[in-house]
Amino acid sequence: MPTREIRHPLIRHKLGLMRRADISTKNFRELAQEVGALLTYEATQDLPLETYEIDGWCGKVQVEKIAGKKITVVPILRAGIGMLDGVLSLIPGAKVSAVGVARNEETLEAHTYLEKLAPDINQRLALIIDPMLATGGSMVATIDLLKKAGCKEIRAMVLVAAPEGIEVVEKAHPDVQIYTASIDQRLNEHGYIVPGLGDAGDKIFGTKQKDA
């Protein structure tokens, strides 16, 4: 499936604030949650609904709810945690399935070190969240893991994506829809997205940077 770049004015504005070199941990963290919530709105527009009856103030009324099992949100640790609250603000009943993936800084290859999945994940839509889609290694490893667990419908949301990473994921898993706030220019020689956001994990957790 082709990657969807969501160019909503609010997303563009907030993403511009996140790109500031002098942004504080507090502001980056809040903006990551806000953009995560806006992307969630876009990524869930086609969820199936079912009708049921309730007692309203003036009698019986037909209302709608999301059909079937609710979503499981899959943050890729550690940076994916920074988007989690924004997603859960719209889907508070979602299960959370955490996946830990680390990237070798020399080879840029990803390996999985943690998986805590919802026990019925094979019956749920899995929504992967990670601020950055750079080389695509972490995303592919996570999707591989979810499919091995029996997950049949998977979507991914990232704040910023590199064309190289998109190509890797789309080639490995053409059935997975990716939603992003921005498709950036390229990867640099160190595997970082340009212009990107810097190290999103460090900015979310306040490590290796001066807090403004």
UniProtKB/Swiss-Prot annotation:
Binding residue positions for uracil: 193, 198-200
Pfam families, per the entry: UPRTase (PF14681)
The UniProt keyword set, sorted, is: Allosteric enzyme, Glycosyltransferase, GTP-binding, Magnesium, Nucleotide-binding, Transferase
Positions of 5-phospho-alpha-D-ribose 1-diphosphate binding: 78, 103, 130-138, 199
Q: Which CDD domains match?
A: PRTases_typeI
GO terms for MF? GTP binding; magnesium ion binding; uracil phosphoribosyltransferase activity
Enzyme class per UniProt = transferase
Q: What note does UniProt attach to the cofactor annotation?
A: Binds 1 Mg(2+) ion per subunit. The magnesium is bound as Mg-PRPP.
The cofactors required by this protein are: Mg(2+)
Q: Which reaction does it catalyse?
A: UMP + diphosphate = 5-phospho-alpha-D-ribose 1-diphosphate + uracil
Tell me which EC number(s) this protein carries: 2.4.2.9
**Pathway the protein contributes to:** Pyrimidine metabolism; UMP biosynthesis via salvage pathway; UMP from uracil: step 1/1
Q: Which GO terms describe its biological process?
A: UMP salvage; uracil salvage
The UniProt function text for this chain reads:
Catalyzes the conversion of uracil and 5-phospho-alpha-D-ribose 1-diphosphate (PRPP) to UMP and diphosphate.
In Swiss-Prot or TrEMBL terms, this protein is called Uracil phosphoribosyltransferase
Q: What species does this protein belong to?
A: Pseudomonas entomophila (strain L48)
